[in-house]
């Protein structure tokens, strides 16, 4: 056999060995235990190509706005005699959760007007707005929607009326000593608002109404909004920003 024929024979044998090695590698790759080895990019790609496509449905996000108030009786008198109106709702775990009265801003209302109306509807008493306490933002999911809720809260002066729990959404209403608010309010965000109210009442009593910060501008609502409710039964940690919040 000539030198040229020997070289061709070696090249053919090399190609056959290469094909056998490649086939052996593929067989080892396909025989990997599914639970013991991390898929290689090749196997992961094949798995993805065989899996059915999932629907591209996205959860709709809605934005809702509410308003409420912390109504103080005796706001000009001794601090130890001051009381605040709270509402109680029973969740599906049977817990009575105390919070501030509040509700959705209706068409044509400002946030302050809503706070006055909702306080009257949920507690039976009348109040006037003195100052803004702040706002609370939180998210929750209900009826296949992600709801971003913003609630505006106000410090309010008690004007008159009798406590009443005729609102079907409210289990109890009560006058609570203002010093007990940190232990009574179920939600951390509302407890922080009570601290702000305490500071504002000190300013009101020491320097008069002129010492209170001016109310932020509030325009009447021009479009109706959805009315969703957070489910307290799922609220294992009241006051969280990302999760069920304090009611309507």
Curated annotation (Swiss-Prot):
Known cofactor(s): Mg(2+); Mn(2+)
A Pfam match: NUDIX
Source superkingdom: Bacteria
Positions bound to Mg(2+): 103, 118, 121-122
EC numbers on record: 3.6.1.-
Upregulating conditions: A possible member of the dormancy regulon. Induced in response to reduced oxygen tension (hypoxia). It is hoped that this regulon will give insight into the latent, or dormant phase of infection.
Motif (Nudix box): 103-124
Membrane-spanning segments: none
SUPFAM superfamilies in the record: Nudix
Biased composition (Low complexity): 31-44
UniProt entry keywords in alphabetical sequence: Hydrolase, Magnesium, Manganese, Metal-binding, Mutator protein
Family, similarity comment: Belongs to the Nudix hydrolase family.
Miscellaneous comment in the UniProt entry for this protein: There are 4 mutT paralogs in M.tuberculosis; the exact function of each is unknown.
Name of the protein this chain belongs to: Putative mutator protein MutT4
Organism: Mycobacterium tuberculosis (strain ATCC 25618 / H37Rv)
């Amino acid at each position: 056999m000539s030198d040229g024929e020997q070289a061709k024979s070696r090249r053919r044998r090399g190609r056959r060995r290469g094909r056998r090695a490649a086939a052996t590698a593929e067989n080892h790759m396909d025989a990997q235990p599914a639970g013991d080895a991390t898929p290689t990019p090749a196997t992961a790609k094949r798995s993805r190509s065989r899996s059915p496509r999932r629907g591209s449905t996205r959860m709709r996000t809605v934005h809702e706005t509410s308003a409420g108030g912390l109504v103080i009786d005796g706001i000009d008198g001794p601090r130890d005699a001051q009381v605040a109106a709270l509402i109680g709702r029973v969740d599906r775990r049977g817990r009575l959760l105390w919070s501030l009265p509040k509700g959705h801003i209706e068409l044509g209302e400002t946030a302050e007007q809503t706070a006055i109306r909702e306080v009257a509807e949920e507690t039976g008493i009348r109040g006037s707005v003195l100052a803004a306490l702040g706002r609370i933002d939180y998210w929750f999911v209900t009826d296949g929607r992600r709801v971003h809720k913003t609630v505006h809260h106000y410090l309010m002066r008690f004007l008159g009326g009798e406590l009443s729990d005729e609102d079907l959404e409210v289990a109890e209403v009560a006058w609570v000593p203002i010093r007990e608010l940190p232990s009574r309010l179920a939600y951390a965000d509302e407890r922080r608002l009570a601290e702000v109210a305490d500071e504002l009442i000190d300013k009101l009593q020491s320097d008069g109404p002129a010492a209170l910060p001016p109310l932020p501008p509030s325009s009447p609502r021009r479009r109706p909004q959805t009315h969703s409710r957070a489910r307290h039964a799922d609220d294992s940690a009241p006051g969280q920003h990302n999760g069920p919040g304090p009611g309507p």
